[in-house]
Amino acid sequence: MQTQGRVAGKVSAKTTLPEAHSRGYLPHIEGAEFQMITYRLGDALPKDVMQRLTLLDREKRHTATEQLLDAGYGQCWLAYPNIAKIIIDNWLYFAGKRYTILAYVVMPNHVHVLIRVFEGSLLAKIVQSWKSYTAKQIATQLSLNGLKPERPIWQPDYWDRFIRNQT
């Protein structure tokens, strides 16, 4: 099951100069208005595969990771409509306040969301709040059904792609 959506909003063509930072995993860009974000469930890739991926350069690692995620490894908790709804409702909660959602898709073991970050909001804080809140909600939902994830709900980091207008 894939849950897709598009939320309309006023989109500015203005971009600001981005600032890069890293928590030691992946480099991230702040200050960029348009961002494509991907994050995955904690069990979406086996540990041995993740170790092999570190040997690849960034672009090849990203491509290989996307292919592996699309193969549907792990518990695929996001395939359940009630779990996918937690994710979507969470994104929509701050839409219009911290960011505009342009498009999203919830896959069985990972998500993609395209947003325009508002001035004064930090992408790292936005993603951290999404993952923190939804991890608690998903764990609660799973426990109500007698299920418990073997690994943390979410991976420790996320992929972001700064979208720029070069016209």
Residue ranges and their predicted role:
Residues M1-T167:
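Short catalytic/metal-binding and nucleic-acid-binding patches
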